């Protein structure tokens, strides 16, 4: 069976550590991560996972055909847009809660899932 390859995009909340640990414990391989800027969490992420490459351009992860699933734990108001961008790039997504912060975001997520047939999970 093929090993699931994942990436982390948006590491603004500490839940990313639990999300990633759970997936790694299941045998997934994290091939990279991206965050828009630096903070204590990104510093801790780099320290905890020094062998996972940080990309400075998220498009390097979005365009990588080997990545099956993207973990997202950004600021809540940014999660929906990141998820939509990932699904439009052919990736399934697993978000920290809440997955969206408005009914408009929810509607756009639903439309994207129908259009792309990608998995949106929280």
Where in the sequence are the language-model features?
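General small-molecule cofactor/ligand-binding pocket signal
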Residues: 31, 55, 121
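Beta-loop-alpha module in the N-terminal Rossmann-like domain of NAD(P)-dependent dehydrogenases
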Residues: 39, 49-112
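Short, Asp-centered acidic motifs that coordinate Mg2+ and/or phosphate
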Residues: 32, 68-69, 119
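Rossmann-fold dehydrogenase core element
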Residues: 108-122
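N-terminal Rossmann-like dinucleotide-binding module
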Residues: 1-49
């Amino acid at each position: 069976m093929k090993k699931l390859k994942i990436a982390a995009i948006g590491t603004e909340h500490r839940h990313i550590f639990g999300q990633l640990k759970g997936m790694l414990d299941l045998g997934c391989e994290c091939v990279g991560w991206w965050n828009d800027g630096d903070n204590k969490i990104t510093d801790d992420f780099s320290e905890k996972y020094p062998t996972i490459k940080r990309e400075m351009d998220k498009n390097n992860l979005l365009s990588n055909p080997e990545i099956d699933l993207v973990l997202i734990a950004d600021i809540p108001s940014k999660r929906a847009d990141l998820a939509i961008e990932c699904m439009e790039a052919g990736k399934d997504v697993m978000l920290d809660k809440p997955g969206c912060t408005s009914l408009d975001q929810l509607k756009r997520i639903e439309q994207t899932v129908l259009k792309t047939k990608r998995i949106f999970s929280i």
